Amino acid sequence: MTEKIYDAIVVGAGFSGLVAARELSAQGRSVLIIEARHRLGGRTHVVNFLGRPVEIGGAGVHWCQPHVFAEMQRYGFGFKEAPLADLDKAYMVFADGQKIDVPPATFDEEYTTAFEKFCSRSRELFPRPYSPLDNHEVSNLDGVSARDHLESLGLNELQLASMNAELTLYGGAPTTELSYPSFVKFHALASWDTITFTDSEKRYHVQGGTNALCQAIFDDCRADSEFGVPVEAVAQTDNGVTVTLADKRVFRALTCVLTLPTKVYADVRFEPPLPPEKRAFIEHAEMADGAELYVHVRQNLGNTFTFCDDPNPFNAVQTYAYDDELGTILKITIGRQSLINLENFDAIAAEIRKIHGDVEVLEALPYNWAMDEYARTSYPAMRKGWFSRYKDMAKPENRLFFAGSATADGWHEYIDGAIESGIRVGREIRHFMKATA
């Protein structure tokens, strides 16, 4: 029997890989999807907590994000709204652990002031945000850290602490490491509007969950698939690509799409080796040390939101669900998981009590993306000096094509960026196949 040679092997079944596979199969190409996990979704995933579906990875979507909105429209998915409006209570925990109760309207006003000052040049720097490097000043500013810029703005204590908490969440590292313009780009992508940006990151999720949207895209692929075994090696010649799995099975194709989280590339042997600029990006560019956590509290805390400044381990703590019978489910976004042992229930409970007083913490559901061997980072946050080099990672290498949200021109820490990159590599391979036919 003749060995099958695919037109394309797609490594990874997150949004970028699934969209790439669908685009290629729609061109009539034969496609094989290889996924190390036993599921779809990559760094998005829905699990059950107290009988409720909860997102433990990437989840924020919005109609200002054109690629994910198009997929939601295509497959008939609406928006689920998080309970962030009409807060009952808002809190700020400062770097030294001091907590203050802030009237929600004041909290919103002070944070918005800080955010708009931080992003005040977003239209000037990113007049066309899907061509983020067209303005050469962006590359010149890439070496400026978010913290350096933040401290230049003359903010008051609450403004500085709340914005630094937000930036720590996005950077997954001390804000002295995060590229200033890499964050400002998000404001530009949200039509240079702060409320739109905040809604895109915290307010709206996919109705039915990211799992269901991934499944809809997968069902639209005419592709073979292999789940549960990681890729060990990728070798290319002038004539094709050979992909070897950890169980030593070998698959061959004319092209290969790689959608691995950036730091996971170091676990794959490439022959010939990837070029120096890609290897440097893999080693140095990203730093997001993040995790997600849900906590069940016996008391009904109402609708609350808390920012905790670095080095507090919990950066954003918000009510997910609440009533007198349930008590409260809190959703916690952690920029730096290394600051707390998420396997230690008592440590988690102690942090919750720093915010909400003497409450009874009943249960916790953590997911540590930074310690996940198939993720290594929670999202592609860009270290200062590296945002301007993202195209080094996106550039094809002969028969190898690179996707994943880190390679996106637009929303690089979001589902939208992943989908954008999958569409791009579908186009790149179509052109490549025509040129080499």
Swiss-Prot record:
Signal peptide: none annotated. It comes from Shinella sp. (strain HZN7). This is (S)-6-hydroxynicotine oxidase. The gene is nctB. Binds 1 FAD per subunit. Its cofactor is FAD. FAD binds at residues 16, 35-37, 43, 57-60, 231, 405, 413-415. Belongs to the flavin monoamine oxidase family. Homodimer. Gene3D superfamilies: FAD/NAD(P)-binding domain. It catalyses: (S)-6-hydroxynicotine + O2 + H2O = 6-hydroxypseudooxynicotine + H2O2; (S)-6-hydroxynicotine + O2 = 6-hydroxy-N-methylmyosmine + H2O2. Keywords: Alkaloid metabolism, FAD, Flavoprotein, Nucleotide-binding, Oxidoreductase, Plasmid. Pathway: Alkaloid degradation; nicotine degradation; 6-hydroxypseudooxynicotine from nicotine (S-isomer route): step 2/2. It is an enzyme of class 1 (oxidoreductase). Its EC number is 1.5.3.5. Partially inhibited by Co(2+) or Zn(2+) and significantly inhibited by Ag(+), Cu(2+) and Hg(2+). Optimum pH is 7.0. Stable between pH 6.0 and 9.8. Transmembrane segments: none annotated. Disruption phenotype: Disruption of the gene abolishes the ability of the mutant to degrade (S)-6-hydroxynicotine. Optimum temperature is 40 degrees Celsius. Stable at temperatures lower than 50 degrees Celsius. GO terms for biological process: alkaloid metabolic process; nicotine catabolic process. It comes from the Bacteria. Involved in the degradation of L-nicotine. Catalyzes the oxidation of (S)-6-hydroxynicotine (6-hydroxy-L-nicotine) to 6-hydroxypseudooxynicotine. Oxidation of the pyrrolidine ring of (S)-6-hydroxynicotine leads to the formation of the optically inactive 6-hydroxy-N-methylmyosmine, which hydrolyzes spontaneously to 6-hydroxypseudooxynicotine. Acts with absolute stereospecificity on the L-form of 6-hydroxynicotine. Also involved in the degradation of nornicotine, and catalyzes the oxidation of 6-hydroxynornicotine to 6-hydroxymyosmine, which hydrolyzes to 6-hydroxypseudooxynornicotine. GO terms for molecular function: (S)-6-hydroxynicotine oxidase activity; nucleotide binding. Pfam families: Amino_oxidase (PF01593).
